[in-house]
Amino acid sequence: MGYLRNIGAIAKGMGITFSEMFKPTTVENYPDGPGVLRGAVFQERFRGMHVLQRDENGLEKCVACFLCAAACPSNCIYIEAAENTETNRVSGAERYAKVYNIDYNRCIFCGYCVEACPTDAITHGHGFELATFNASNLVYRKEQLLSGKPAHIGANEIFASDSREQQRLDQKAAK
């Protein structure tokens, strides 16, 4: 009698499995699905990759106060400060961040750096495509953070050196 109950339970489970096998999938094909460059919609509070801001005069807002680095629980922000001169004015304050790196190998996107910044120099953008084959590509420099554009956009850019992949990307762009 116990065997019949077990067989019935197995048949019920297999019935559910087989019914799910023939339903249409709801998975988007990455990287061809929604993304930053393909019109994805993000909530205002989305915490994506960081962006360093400039003021209305085009100067950097970062004054190298190190509060963002101090607030970071994962210690992924590295800053080196330098003094502004009259001939070389980078920010509106006495100092500026000569080096500003964020290591996305360590970043947990908590937002503490954004909250700690007194000048609103660092904000969260909408970038989320961080996939790469080399961990050193995930250390973003000041120039990459100021532009607001990631150094690489998804996996397609990584394979661009392969001539066949480059031809496929060119054909796709021409459509």
UniProtKB/Swiss-Prot annotation:
Cofactor requirements of the protein: [4Fe-4S] cluster
Q: Name one Pfam family in it.
A: Fer4_7
**Main localisation, per the record?**
membrane
Q: Where, by residue number, does [4Fe-4S] cluster 1 bind?
A: 62, 65, 68, 117
Tell me the residue numbers annotated for binding [4Fe-4S] cluster 2.
72, 107, 110, 113
Recorded protein name is: NADH-quinone oxidoreductase subunit I 2
Q: Which Gene3D superfamilies match?
A: 3.30.70.3270
Instruction: Name the UniProt key words of this record, in alphabetical order.
Output: 4Fe-4S, Cell inner membrane, Cell membrane, Iron, Iron-sulfur, Membrane, Metal-binding, NAD, Quinone, Repeat, Translocase, Ubiquinone
Its Enzyme Commission number(s) read 7.1.1.-
Domain of life where this protein originates: Bacteria
The UniProt record lists the keyword Transcription: no
List localization entries. Cell inner membrane
State any single GO MF term: NADH:ubiquinone reductase (non-electrogenic) activity
Q: Topology with regard to the membrane? A: Peripheral membrane protein
Reaction(s) the record says it catalyses: a quinone + NADH + 5 H(+)(in) = a quinol + NAD(+) + 4 H(+)(out)
Which PANTHER family does this one have?
NADH DEHYDROGENASE [UBIQUINONE] IRON-SULFUR PROTEIN 8, MITOCHONDRIAL, NADH DEHYDROGENASE UBIQUINONE IRON-SULFUR PROTEIN 8, MITOCHONDRIAL
Family, according to the entry, reads as follows:
Belongs to the complex I 23 kDa subunit family.
Instruction: Name a single GO biological process.
Output: aerobic respiration
Q: Cite the record's note on assembly.
A: NDH-1 is composed of 14 different subunits. Subunits NuoA, H, J, K, L, M, N constitute the membrane sector of the complex.
Task: Enumerate the spans annotated as 4Fe-4S ferredoxin-type domain.
Answer: 50-82, 98-127
Keyword hit for Repeat: yes
Functional note: NDH-1 shuttles electrons from NADH, via FMN and iron-sulfur (Fe-S) centers, to quinones in the respiratory chain. The immediate electron acceptor for the enzyme in this species is believed to be ubiquinone. Couples the redox reaction to proton translocation (for every two electrons transferred, four hydrogen ions are translocated across the cytoplasmic membrane), and thus conserves the redox energy in a proton gradient.
Q: How is the cofactor bound?
A: Binds 2 [4Fe-4S] clusters per subunit.
Which GO CC annotations does the UniProt entry carry? plasma membrane
